[in-house]
Amino acid sequence: MLKKTLESVLSTKESDELISAFDQIGHIIIIRIPDSLTSKKKLIGETLLDQVKSAKSIFYQSSSVDGEFRTRDLEILAGEDKTETEYKESGCRFLVDVRNVFFSPRLSSERTRIAEFVNDGEVMVNMFGGVGIFSIIAAKMKKCTVFNIDINPFATKLCKKNIAINRLAGNVISIHGDASQVINSQLENKSDRTLMLLPEKSDEFLDSAILSTKSGGVIHYYSHIHADKKSDAAKLSEQHYMQITPVKSTILGSKIVRPVGPRFYQTVVDVKIKK
């Protein structure tokens, strides 16, 4: 879509160099531009603002997602220099600040998949819950209680607002803090289901996920895996989990969530544990 939108201002060669996808979150569009085209970034931004009628702000992502809060550097190219927006998904409304919190619209199908897994009456711990999108969608679809933990105070503040917007006070509980510390102090053996939505640190936090999960409960273990063949990625993730887990585990399923680089994939392994 991005290449088609910009075909009037870029040559065929330039268009071929362009990263084809962009993220639209509410009224905000975030694009990545290769070094060879940064001299034209303002033109690209202005053209997108003109062509995409629902957009009010075009930002250039000038860094990868990084740091303790998993944020990215953004540069305004066109429109309003405003990073907070409203995002809608699965009948829910969310306030998101794209500069100060981590959020990806590309995980919508995974959010629905997790919500469909949840049973009425369950308690779920979302260890890296951000602004609460996974948690709120699950609580909206099923009668469950979700503890949404995040170390980023901006995310925790927005999560509390999103809980109120979606009228889920008491169903989703926003907790600010390090997931391991929160679980140790408050949530040991509390969850029927635990989400580990920080794939780059899942191995580090697996013991905490197990601590929070009741015997017979389910852990959704996300990771980044290298695979020469895409078809091998999910199976390699299963093997890795089984090598590192300290508890008896039954694999319920696994899948690729999305590619994240050449021969690298974000995967999820769904496991039932016994303690």
Task: Go through the PLM ranges and name each one.
Residues 1-275:
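SAM-dependent transferase fold signal centered on methyltransferase-like domains
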